[in-house]
Structure formats: C-alpha cells, structure tokens
C-alpha cells in the first residue's frame, strides 16, 4: 500500500512545480491544493491546516504519511517514501 502524500502548494511557485514533477517522475500518487487558486473561504480553511504543520506557512509543505517536509528536499522526500 502506498504511503499517503499530500502537497500544499502555490501554482506559481517554482519549488512547488519541481516537487510535483519529481513525484510524477517517481510515479508517486499525491493529492495537492494550489492555495492561490482556491476561493477565499477554502484558502483560509486550508491555510489553518498548513499553519498546524508548518508555522511559517511556506510552500511547498509536503505531508508523507506522518512526516512533514517543508520545501523541495529530494533526499528527505525519497527517505519518507522509502525510495
């Protein structure tokens, strides 16, 4: 069974795009929210989730299982995924 992967991203963020591309290249399925494309109500709700995981609320915020990774860090992502 695959570890659940959730990304909190911005559509214009180069590190967010690199993270998605990396996961796609590794054939990893993931859910994501591009916060800047959400309506205000949804964005505010999800920002509260992000703040609980990453108090600085920076992007990408990546949740792999129970591990939170802030930023595009290939080595940490690989380790969390067991790749």
Residue map of PLM features:
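Thiol-/selenol-based redox modules, centered on thioredoxin-like
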Residues: 78-83
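Thioredoxin-like thiol-disulfide oxidoreductase module
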Residues: 35-56
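A short, hydrophobic beta-strand/beta-hairpin element that forms part of a small beta-sheet core
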Residues: 60-69
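Nucleotide phosphate-binding site architecture
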Residues: 14, 36, 70
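A basic- and aromatic-enriched beta-loop-alpha substructure that forms the phosphate/nucleotide-
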Residues: 74
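Local sequence-structure signature of Cys/Sec-based thiol-disulfide redox active-site neighborhoods
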Residues: 1-33
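Active-site-adjacent beta-strand anchor residues
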Residues: 9, 70-71
């Amino acid at each position: 069974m695959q570890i659940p992967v959730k990304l909190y991203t911005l559509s214009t963020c180069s590190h967010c795009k690199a993270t998605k591309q990396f996961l796609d290249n590794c054939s990893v399925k993931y859910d994501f929210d591009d916060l800047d494309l959400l309506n205000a109500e949804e964005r505010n709700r999800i920002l509260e989730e992000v703040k609980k995981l990453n108090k600085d609320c920076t992007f990408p915020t990546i949740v792999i299982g129970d591990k939170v990774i802030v930023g595009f860090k290939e080595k940490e992502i690989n380790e969390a995924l067991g790749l």
